[in-house]
């Protein structure tokens, strides 16, 4: 966009997302909300296609004196995952200048969006959809914590937890993501979670987990998401050791289709790994969004703290260069390599050595791999995101055109017309044979956050929830 201008630019210290040390970065804040950091001050204002997807729109700003004085944090909810970036500058005045500039850009973008919503010819359609959704939650009693049995902790992190639940009324299984409200709303600030939950409601794709309900309690936001029962892809691969190239092509195509959809909505998934891929009862891929930033794990040898699964991290993430959509194509390369080769492309128990491999080591292939498969994986696992297959402006189209996928009809992929190469042996959506036996037989308890909640974690009156009016959603009205 030619009318995008730089609002503020300067050096700041940015804390690494995975290796928690501080690095100097030259940041540009632009009128479109982009906030991009470079290792060196860029000479050319018209920089090449920016890979960064981080925007200050709909974000929450916090100031803190820890772990260093004059620190500020930008936090936002992307899909249902909390993304957080931490910066520090030398003086309180500098911090004030940055936070005021960021807030001004965010406020202006918010106003523009509201104006667009009011003037847009589609706003009436949007409103009808919202009314339908409200109606669905009115006619079907609003969901509360009491409507579910809690079976197993699927994940736990800094901002909340994900629990496998069974809806009492239907017997269906879901993953419930529970986020603490205080991490999303600043004390004096209304969060933008509602807008984000609206994005979630509209995120519908055959290979992405869909949102079934969302509701709130006194101090938590709850997202109830689809949980398919064909088993984790990791489980099936570990049983068979490797998948054929045909089977890998089928799964790879479905993943590309889903990532294409997310990228078109300006969402970078960031967390593609085997553990986040499941199969539905028919054998199609479902990419889960149960991710939470894991508690930091400290590597004793270096005393640096890591966040996440280091084996899957792209080079640009490790180096803490700003990254964007190409990070997902690296993730695709890693999972497809695992499927066809039966191991990770880079692995070492020592994190420092692992990082060196990811950044420097050339990829090696088994002799059994076809030249098309080698070519695809080599392209996806290029260290430089700008040169990576899928890293250019064409994004997924580069991958779709690759010879490994020749003969694939991408519309048929989306329409689920391709026959899955493996069908899980489940008889229905509530068949639990691929679940761990230890947790299908028993339920777990959730500690009530407040003693005065009627049912432990029930919904509260709207008047007592000024920040989150109407944070309630049921997909049943749309199916």
Swiss-Prot record:
Residues modified to Phosphoserine: 472
Keywords from the named record: Acetylation, ATP-binding, Cytoplasm, Disulfide bond, Glycoprotein, Kinase, Membrane, Nucleotide-binding, Nucleus, Phosphoprotein, Serine/threonine-protein kinase, Transferase, Ubl conjugation
Active-site annotation: 271 (proton acceptor)
Gene Ontology molecular function, alphabetical: ATP binding; protein kinase C binding; protein serine kinase activity; protein serine/threonine kinase activity
Domain of life: Eukaryota
InterPro entries: AGC-kinase_C, Akt3, Kinase-like_dom_sf, PH-like_dom_sf, PH_domain, PH_PKB, Pkinase_C, Prot_kinase_dom
Positions carrying N-acetylserine: 2
UniProt xrefs under SMART domains: PH, S_TK_X, S_TKc
Keyword Ribosomal protein annotated: no
Subcellular localization(s) per the UniProt record: Nucleus; Cytoplasm; Membrane
SUPFAM superfamilies referenced in this protein's UniProt entry, alphabetically: PH domain-like (SSF50729), Protein kinase-like (PK-like) (SSF56112)
Domain Protein kinase residue range list: 148-405
Catalytic activity: L-seryl-[protein] + ATP = O-phospho-L-seryl-[protein] + ADP + H(+); L-threonyl-[protein] + ATP = O-phospho-L-threonyl-[protein] + ADP + H(+)
Membrane topology type: Peripheral membrane protein
Disulfide bond entries: 59-76, 293-307
UniProt keyword Repressor, yes or no: no
Record region (Disordered): 446-479
Residue spans of biased composition, Acidic residues class: 451-460
Main location: nucleus
Domain notes: Binding of the PH domain to the phosphatidylinositol 3-kinase alpha (PI(3)K) results in its targeting to the plasma membrane.
Name the UniProt record assigns to this protein: RAC-gamma serine/threonine-protein kinase
Upper taxonomic lineage: Eukaryota, Metazoa, Chordata, Craniata, Vertebrata
């Amino acid at each position: 966009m030619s009318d995008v201008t730089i609002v503020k630019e300067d050096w700041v210290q940015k804390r690494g997302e995975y290796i928690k040390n501080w690095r100097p970065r030259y940041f540009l804040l632009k009128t479109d909300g982009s906030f991009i950091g470079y290792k060196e001050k860029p000479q050319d204002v018209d920089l090449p296609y920016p890979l960064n997807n981080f925007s200050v729109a709909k974000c929450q700003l916090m100031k803190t004196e820890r772990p260093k004085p004059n620190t500020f944090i930008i936090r936002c909810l992307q899909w249902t995952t909390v993304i957080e970036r931490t910066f520090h500058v030398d003086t309180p005045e500098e911090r004030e200048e940055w936070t005021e500039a960021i807030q001004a850009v965010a406020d202006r973008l918010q106003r523009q969006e509201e104006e667009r919503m009011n003037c847009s010819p589609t706003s009436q359609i949007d409103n009808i959809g919202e009314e339908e959704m409200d109606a669905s939650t009115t006619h079907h009693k609003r969901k509360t914590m009491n409507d579910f049995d809690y079976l197993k902790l699927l994940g736990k992190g800094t901002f909340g937890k994900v629990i496998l639940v069974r809806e009492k009324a239907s017997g269906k299984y879901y993953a419930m993501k529970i986020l603490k409200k205080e991490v999303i709303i600043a004390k004096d600030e209304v969060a933008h979670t509602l807008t984000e939950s609206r994005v979630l409601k509209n995120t519908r794709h055959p290979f992405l987990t869909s949102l079934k309900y969302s509701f709130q309690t006194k101090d938590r936001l709850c997202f109830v998401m689809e949980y398919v029962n064909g088993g984790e892809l990791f489980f099936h691969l570990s049983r068979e050791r490797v998948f054929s190239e045909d089977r890998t092509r089928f799964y790879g195509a479905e993943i590309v289709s889903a990532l294409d959809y997310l990228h078109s909505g300006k969402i970078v998934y960031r967390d593609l790994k085997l553990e986040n891929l499941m199969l539905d009862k028919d054998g199609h891929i479902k990419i889960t969004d149960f991710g939470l930033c894991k508690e930091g794990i400290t590597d004793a040898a270096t005393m640096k703290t890591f966040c996440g699964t280091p084996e899957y991290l792209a080079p640009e993430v490790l180096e803490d260069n700003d990254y964007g959509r190409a990070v997902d194509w690296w993730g695709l390369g890693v999972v497809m390599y695992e499927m066809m080769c039966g191991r990770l492309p880079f692995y070492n128990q020592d994190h420092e050595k692992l990082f060196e491999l990811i950044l420097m080591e050339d990829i090696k292939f088994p002799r059994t791999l076809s030249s098309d498969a080698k070519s695809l994986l080599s392209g996806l696992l290029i260290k430089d995101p700008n040169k990576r297959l899928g890293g250019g402006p064409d994004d997924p189209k580069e991958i779709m055109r690759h010879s490994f996928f020749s003969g694939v009809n991408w519309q048929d992929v989306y329409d689920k017309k391709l026959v899955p190469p493996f069908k899980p042996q489940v008889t229905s959506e509530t068949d639990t044979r691929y679940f761990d036996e230890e947790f299908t037989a028993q339920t777990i308890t959730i500690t009530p956050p407040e003693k005065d909640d009627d049912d432990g974690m029930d919904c509260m009156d709207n008047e007592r929830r000024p920040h989150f009016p109407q944070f309630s959603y049921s997909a049943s009205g749309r199916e």
